[in-house]
Structure formats: C-alpha cells, structure tokens
Amino acid sequence: MQHNKILIRQLGLQPYEPISQAMHEFTDARDEDTLDEIWLVEHHPVFTQGQAGKAEHVLVPGDIPVIQSDRGGQVTYHGPGQQVMYVLLNLKRRKLGVRELVTLLEQTVVNTLAEYGIESHPRADAPGVYVGDRKICSLGLRIRKGCSFHGLALNIAMDLAPFLRINPCGYAGMEMTQMRQWQPEVTPETVAPRLVANLLALLNHPPHEYLPQQ
C-alpha cells in the first residue's frame, strides 16, 4: 500500500453537522495504514464557533444556526460559494508540525490566488489569508492522535452579508472579501482543483486519487 497516497473527495453542497461527524468518525477510526484524505465541500449557511469562541462575538445570528465546533479559533461563517477544504492528514507520517501545516495551508491559498492575479498574504497575529486588510480565507484545525482535521474556508463567490452578523474570528469590524471581487466568473468548481494542486505541490507531489462524488 502507498501510505503516501492522498484520496480526494468532492462532496458538493452539504449541511455542516453530518460532515463534521463523518470527519470525527474518520479521524477516530484511522490507524497507521489509513490513507490521508482531502474533503472538498460547500456548506449550507451556518456559523461555527471554535474552541476559543466567545458568545459575544456572535452579534445577530438571526435565522442562521450557530454550531459549536472543536476546531481552533473563534466564530466564522460557512455558506454556498465558499470552498471549504478539510485536510485529514497523518502529520507524523508526513513529518509535519502543526505550525508547518498552518503555514502550508496559508501558502496553498496565497499560491492559488496568485494564479488568478490576486495578491494576498498571511498575518502573524491572525491566522488566515488576507488581501490588504480584508480577510479572504479562514483557517482552523484540530489535531488528534497526531492527525489533523478541519481545515480552511476560501471565499469565492458568496453572499458576504452574514459575516456582518458576527465578529469574524473574534475581530470586531474585520472586513471580509472574496475572489469574485477580482474575477467575476470564478466559482468553487473552477477553484477547487487549483487549490488541491497547490496543496499537493507543497506536500511534494504525493500520489493522489480523486474519488467519484457519491
């Protein structure tokens, strides 16, 4: 078996909770022989509170559910038109530290955006990726048994208004942006393969396989 191989699942538009549960079950059940996986998904509208999340950062949730998550970080919003990429990696096997993985994911996004002519950067004081002062990608991870789960959420072509109902990632007045502002035709379907390709490049091009959407 090629332990280095990564399986890539395109899950489409899904509610948050069943995918979160499946991700936990996958991580709990995995052993040394379990292949790493990348899950690509868009979520129905939902606010998720990270482990460090404070209730006061959820300002006016209205009709959008607020769900507690065990990822790192504070509150964020997921909705259609945002590409979520969950990274289910055995860090020990890949000889990656947690900080290295965060840097690698941020660089994956920076490299992907550069392909679309969008200049972006990470910030030392606030994980994620930014275009100027505006946030375009949120990042939150959890490590269990030396394996990562959760991942990143890249704003592509979505309704950004729900972000006004929260202090994104715990920062009052944090402005959000998305790829559509620079590339009007862009969609999660077109960006996802570039995101995966850039992640695989930074992981030194491991063998990989796209699984058919179920």
Swiss-Prot record:
BPL/LPL catalytic domain boundaries: 32-207
PROSITE patterns for the chain: BPL_LPL_CATALYTIC (PS51733), LIPB (PS01313)
Localization, UniProt: Cytoplasm
Positions with a binding annotation for substrate: R71, G72, G73, Q74, V75, T76, Y77, H78, S138, L139, G140, G151, L152, A153
Entry EC no(s): 2.3.1.181
The keyword Transferase is annotated on this UniProt entry: yes
Key word Zinc present: no
Origin: domain of life: Bacteria
Top EC class of this enzyme: transferase
Major location category of this protein: cytoplasm
The reaction(s) this protein catalyses: octanoyl-[ACP] + L-lysyl-[protein] = N(6)-octanoyl-L-lysyl-[protein] + holo-[ACP] + H(+)
UniProt keyword list: Acyltransferase, Cytoplasm, Transferase
GO cellular component terms, semicolon-separated: cytoplasm
Residue numbers annotated as active site: C169 (acyl-thioester intermediate)
GO molecular function (one): lipoyl(octanoyl) transferase activity
GO aspect biological process, one term: protein modification process
Annotated metabolic or biological route of this protein: Protein modification; protein lipoylation via endogenous pathway; protein N(6)-(lipoyl)lysine from octanoyl-[acyl-carrier-protein]: step 1/2
Family: Belongs to the LipB family.
Note: In the reaction, the free carboxyl group of octanoic acid is attached via an amide linkage to the epsilon-amino group of a specific lysine residue of lipoyl domains of lipoate-dependent enzymes.
Known function: Catalyzes the transfer of endogenously produced octanoic acid from octanoyl-acyl-carrier-protein onto the lipoyl domains of lipoate-dependent enzymes. Lipoyl-ACP can also act as a substrate although octanoyl-ACP is likely to be the physiological substrate.
PANTHER family in UniProt: LIPOYLTRANSFERASE 2, MITOCHONDRIAL-RELATED, OCTANOYLTRANSFERASE
Record protein name field: Octanoyltransferase
Species of provenance: Klebsiella pneumoniae (strain 342)
Classification lineage: Bacteria, Pseudomonadati, Pseudomonadota, Gammaproteobacteria, Enterobacterales
Gene: lipB
